[in-house]
């Protein structure tokens, strides 16, 4: 939705897109990731600082929390669209629990705002992506995340300290590295105990060879 616009999409534009997707899915759950700009995903119309290493800078949820009006607009559209299906919302690039708490507070504000405006809405379930090692190694800190989704591309990049946009170190960004597999295995074990849902996205999610590992 964001990446295919020449500028920032309006609340109505986002609402229509989300609603169309949810109505198509019917009763099936639909997970929508909030704005994940920055790094390898620059976004026209959004002010982003020049950074020497954007993969470690202001991207994902970090950027959304610095642009609260943009984030609020998306959350309003998501809450309105949630009336039309089974919506889950996940936030990317989470490092510390305070970021998730701030998101939840903003979501509550948006719900209160929509109530005051007498606009129909439903508060979606809120989860997070696990791609930053600090979050991957300490999932017990995120007790209020309804679910986790492992962002394997970034997790591999950060665990191997190998930028995935540089071909001369691409061979080091190995998803089969024992450290990567260990972190994912420990996340699975944590979620088995905590009851939190866990899914896998990114390139590893399309490779059946990793299922047995």
Where are these regions (language model features)?
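Conserved alpha/beta-domain cores
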Residues: 1-213
